[in-house]
Amino acid sequence: MVFATGRMSFKKVLNAYIKNWQEAKKKLPADYKISLNLFVAYDTDYLKTQSTDYTNLSQDIVDQFDQIVFLGAKNALRSIERLEEYSKLDKKELRSIFAAGYAGKRNAILFAALENHMDYLLFLDDDEYPLAVTKSKEVCLWSGQHIILSHLMEIPNADYTNGLHCGYISPIPQIPFNEDFTEDDLRVFIEAISNDILNWDN
């Protein structure tokens, strides 16, 4: 479960997803084994917050996860240093990948997930609750949606799942093509993550 955020209110959304997860577990087969992990990449500059606004979670939330990884600006710098050792990208290119803002935070999470050997990631919007409103006659009803369960059941058979609660697709940083990273490499990547917003044709 992943959040790229700069809003303190993400903790309220996270709490709603914990309740969503507790309901989802009831619908899973008894022998379905899942290790649930939380990755939070936070931006303290976005709304002038501090790291503890994101890292100070209630024990009830902490107990739901097998592992929690927080990623702030210092983590991005350490990622750049580690990648510099064995990457063919230079420091400027690496800084563009882990830049401030939404895309840089998502990229930091992707790298941390690789380092932590995650099988799947579910990016969730930090300002959308797992709810939907429907109109029934003259009344509007708020109903829970099975966001986590839906993705969990589909992702083992897919390269990528996406939905209305998953946030925007990360902008891809500008990296010049060379013999190590060709236009065809980028095309394969784009096709793997393509959807109605981002695909090879547009």
Question: PLM features: what roles do these ranges have?
Answer:
Residues 1-56, 85-86, 93:
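N-proximal low-complexity "stem/linker" segments adjacent to membrane-targeting elements
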Residues 3-4, 41, 124-125, 163-164:
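Short His-Asn-centered micro-motif
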Residues 7-8, 45, 127-129, 166-169:
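Short, solvent-exposed loop/turn segments at secondary-structure junctions
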Residues 15-26, 105-110, 142-151:
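Short alpha-helical segments and helix-capping/turn motifs at coil-helix boundaries
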Residues 37-38, 119-122, 158-160:
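Beta-sheet entry/capping signal
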Residues 46-116, 141:
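Active-site-proximal specificity loops/subdomain of glycosyltransferases
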Residues 118-135:
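Short beta-strand-to-loop acidic/aromatic patch adjacent to the donor-nucleotide binding site
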Residues 131-202:
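Conserved catalytic core of nucleotide-sugar-dependent glycosyltransferases
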